[in-house]
Every structure is written in structure tokens, then in C-alpha cells.
Amino acid sequence: SYIKGKVVAAALQNKSGEFLKPSVAAGAKALNGISLDKDLAGKNPNPTAKGAYPIATLTWVLAYKTGNGDNAKVVQDAFNYMLSDAAQNKAPSLGFVPLKGDILAKSKAAVNKIGK
């Protein structure tokens, strides 16, 4: 999430030379521009896109492909909700960046691999 309330955030310079304060829009430019590999690891922690905030990161959650037993469906349901349109549409009001495009698609595919 980004800074709210009476705290003043510093504007940081990104690789495009812009000075930006943290916001959902600037975070979205950064996070949704990350290219993920098959293990959902990104390679560019300092985005080059115009309008992208230079310090942004994803929240990582580890889940097992096997060994979940009877909890597998509950775990999948929880992650599927987090990645749903309903949850992603709430993200900005909570100070988080909604996931879109490749990151969202790869995250949903990873959830489908969670098994018993």
C-alpha cells in the first residue's frame, strides 16, 4: 500500500527521469509492467516505463502443489477470491495496486496447480 494520512511522501526519480510520488496509478505502471518467468519471479525491480513509481513490489504467497490434503480447495478458493475482479476492484481503495494482464493470468494459473 502507499502512504496515507499526514505523512508526506518523497517524490523519487524513475529510470525515465520523472519524479513521482507513490500512488496506485504509478504503482500499477510499475507492477503490471514486470515480466514474470515460469516461477512468477520478476527481473526488473526498477521499472523503465513512463509514469512508473521506482519502488514497487508484489506480495508473495507460497502454496504447495501437493500435501494440502482436504484444505486444497479452501486454499484455492481463497486465492481465487484474492485474484477475482471483485477483490482486484477493491485494491485501490485499500491502497494496493490491482493486478492486470500477464501477472494476473500467471497468478491464476499458479492457483490452479494447488492440489491435495
Role assignments for model-derived ranges:
Residues 91:
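Bilobed periplasmic-binding protein-like "clamshell/Venus-flytrap" ligand-binding domains
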Residues 1-85, 94-116:
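Flexible, solvent-exposed loop/hinge segments that line or gate ligand/substrate-binding clefts
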